[in-house]
Amino acid sequence: MNTFIVYDSQFGNTERIAQAIADTVRAFGQASAVHVDPAHPVSFQGVDLLILGSPTQGFRPTLAMQFLLGNVSSQALRGLAVACFDTRFRGRLWKSSAAPRMARQLRTMGVEPIIQPESFFVKAMKKEGPLLAGEVERAATWARMLFTKAQASHPAMR
């Protein structure tokens, strides 16, 4: 299975999570993690599992991730297993975050994520983090679960 992780990262926290996910799924197949760049469109050709990750800014994905989602065609995503994650503060005041919004946008394009969006947490009220203890390990666990779910829901990936 070929896994492609597209992420944005402002302070390195989302990148650390993306790399932990890539490192974990490499045990099962090919995996690469790339920083989203609006100036360089990405191709999903040959991708089986697409994972999108963004820090939460103003309860939504970064502008670069919004640009990617706003400019990719639903046809380009057809047949892919897709999942979303974000990094954010933990707290009751945070009603929304980037990953659920990305998943919602995918649904409006006719693409159903194979698993609920996941949030990984940074130290409270510090934009630059660091990630809370155990979040990188939790990302690896999530990646294994996600990979298993992708194989079960997309038989061609076995």
Stretch-by-stretch model annotation:
Residues 13-16, 23-34, 46-158:
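FMN-binding flavodoxin-like domain, especially the glycine-rich phosphate-binding loop
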Residues 1-4:
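Extreme N-terminal starter segment of soluble prokaryotic enzymes
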